[in-house]
C-alpha cells in the first residue's frame, strides 16, 4: 500500500507517542510542495522512523525526528530522516547494510540481526526505484542519526502521484 510520506509517518508516530508520551517523541516535517503528493510504499519510511524510536531514544530526553523531502534533480527525490538520538559509530553504521549482519537472530530481543530493516530497505529501494537510487546513513555517538534515501522516480515501478 502506498501513502504520501507525511501522512504515513504521522500515522506511525501517533502510535509511538501513545506508547512513550506526547512529550517524548517530537517530529517535524519539511516537505517541499513539488513532492508533497509523491507516494512511497509503507515499508520504506516506516521502518526508518521505527528504528529511530527503538534504537535512538535515550532514557530521559525527548527524541526529535525531522523528516525532510525535496526534489533532487529532475526525476528524483531525497528523503532525510534525522534524529537527535544516541547515534552510532562508523563501524555499526557500516554493518547496517552488511548482508551477514542482517540475518535473523532468534536470541535478539527485537527478533532480528543488526541492520535487518536497513538491509531490507536498501534492497527494496534498488528493486523498486532502480540502480541509481541509494540509501546512506550518517551518524556519530551522541550526535544522532540521519538516514538518506535518494529515489530515482524515473525508474520507479509505482504510480508515484496521487
What are these regions (language model features)?
Residues 2-138, 146-150:
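Two-component histidine phosphotransfer core
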Residues 152-157:
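Two-component histidine kinase transmitter core
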Residues 160-162:
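Intrinsically disordered, low-complexity acidic/proline-/asparagine-rich linker or regulatory tail/stalk regions
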Amino acid at each position: 500500500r502506498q501513502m504520501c510520506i507525511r501522512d504515513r509517518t504521522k500515522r506511525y508516530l501517533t502510535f509511538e507517542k501513545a506508547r512513550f508520551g506526547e512529550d517524548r517523541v517530537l517530529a517535524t516535517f519539511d516537505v517541499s510542495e513539488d513532492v508533497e503528493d509523491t507516494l512511497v510504499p509503507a515499508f520504506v519510511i516506516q521502518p526508518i522512523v521505527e528504528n529511530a524510536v527503538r534504537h535512538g531514544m535515550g532514557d530521559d530526553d525527548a527524541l526529535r525526528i525531522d523528516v525532510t523531502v525535496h526534489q533532487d534533480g529532475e526525476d528524483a527525490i531525497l528523503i532525510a530522516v534525522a534524529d537527535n538520538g544516541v547515534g552510532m559509530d562508523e563501524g555499526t553504521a557500516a554493518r547496517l547494510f552488511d548482508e551477514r549482519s542482517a540475518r535473523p537472530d532468534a536470541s535478539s530481543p527485537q527478533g532480528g540481526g543488526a541492520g535487518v530493516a536497513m538491509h531490507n530497505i536498501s534492497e527494496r529501494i534498488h528493486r523498486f526505484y532502480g540502480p541509481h537510487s541509494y540509501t546512506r546513513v550518517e551518524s556519530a555517538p551522541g550526535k544522532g542519526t540521519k538516514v538518506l534515501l535518494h529515489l530515482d522516480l524515473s525508474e520507479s515501478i509505482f504510480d508515484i502521484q496521487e
